[in-house]
Swiss-Prot record:
Family label: Belongs to the universal ribosomal protein uL2 family.
Pfam family, one: Ribosomal_L2
Localization per Swiss-Prot or TrEMBL: Plastid, Chloroplast
Sections of the chain in a coiled coil: none
GO molecular-function terms, A-Z: rRNA binding; structural constituent of ribosome; transferase activity
Region (Disordered): 1-31, 227-277
PANTHER family per the UniProt record, alphabetical: LARGE RIBOSOMAL SUBUNIT PROTEIN UL2M (PTHR13691:SF5), RIBOSOMAL PROTEIN L2 (PTHR13691)
Gene3D superfamilies the UniProt entry points to: 2.30.30.30, Nucleic acid-binding proteins (2.40.50.140), Ribosomal protein L2, domain 3 (4.10.950.10)
One Gene Ontology term, aspect cellular component: chloroplast
SUBUNIT field: Part of the 50S ribosomal subunit.
GO biological process: translation
Official protein name in the record: Large ribosomal subunit protein uL2cz/uL2cy
Length: 277
């Protein structure tokens, strides 16, 4: 990923650092892979109540249908384009398969236009290839990992994400996920070899508030400047302290270090080591 810095003429460009490779493709667009989506609610539930704060507005988006299942088995595909996707931080690749099928997949790091990929059971351990965990050697870097067999990849799909296969025993494989969590997954589940591209996404700087508004992100207001009815930190005369021993969330729970995972989940016995916060 190449970071582009503007010539300093305004504060917006002086503080901004954008991706010079993020370009949309219009020439080879497949209409059957792109469709509109009605983004209703903007952080509201069915009753219109805010359930996810700081969301709203933003530019209209077209959804790209991504092939997370990689179920074109034993058919070679060629990378035709590498495109920007407004719905995720990672880039996507348009793949032309030998049987005429065309699909989008996540862009593996290092993949270029013209490379070939394949998915199946006995395929080479090569970047971009998809195969079951049971056919991979220990230490393989993987992404787009299935949790349920046949459902498609659900883990390690963000830009720069990579997991590691560290053990195989019985019917399960042990993975170290990008969060640091170590958990068990069925060896029959599939994953893609390599790391997700666009690893330098954290180096980007939007530079101004308007750029964040385009992404559908609204301003974040500190609780200490709110009224007591709106936040536990609110109220007081002038610049007053929060009036508590420890910071709290808008709903009164401890703000620092509180575990937010739901209790008694089915996967508790599959997690060998909890993720590090």
């Amino acid at each position: 990923m190449a970071i582009h810095l503007y010539k300093t003429s305004t504060p917006s460009t002086r503080n901004g650092a954008v991706d010079s490779q993020a370009k949309s493709n219009t020439r080879n667009t497949r209409k059957n892979l792109i469709y509109g989506q009605h983004r209703c609610g903007k952080g509201r539930n069915a009753r219109g109540i805010i359930t996810a704060r700081h969301r709203g507005g933003g530019h209209k988006r077209l959804y790209r249908k991504i092939d997370f299942r990689r179920n074109e088995k034993d058919i070679y595909g060629r990378i035709v384009t590498i495109e920007y996707d407004p719905n995720r931080n990672a880039y996507i690749c348009l793949i032309h398969y030998g049987d005429g099928e065309k699909r989008y997949i996540l862009h593996p790091r290092g993949a270029i236009i013209g490379d070939t990929i394949i998915s199946g059971t006995e395929v080479p351990i090569k970047m971009g290839n998809a195969l079951p965990l049971t056919d991979m050697p220990l230490g393989t870097a993987i992404h787009n990992i299935e949790i349920t067999l046949g459902k498609g990849g659900q883990l390690a799909r963000a830009a720069g994400a990579v997991a590691k296969l560290i053990a195989k025993e019985g019917k399960s494989a042990t993975l170290k996920l990008p969060s640091g969590e170590v958990r068990l997954i069925s060896k029959n589940c599939s994953a893609t070899v390599g790391q997700v591209g666009n690893t330098g996404v954290n180096q980007k700087s939007l530079g101004r508030a308007g750029s964040k508004c385009w992404l559908g992100k609204r301003p974040v207001v500190r609780g200490v400047v709110m009224n007591p009815v709106d936040h536990p930190h609110g109220g007081g005369e002038g610049r007053a302290p929060i009036g508590r021993k420890k910071p709290a969330t808008p709903w009164g729970y401890p703000a620092l270090g509180r575990r937010s995972r739901k209790r008694n989940k089915y996967s508790d016995n599959l997690i060998l080591r909890r993720r590090s916060k």
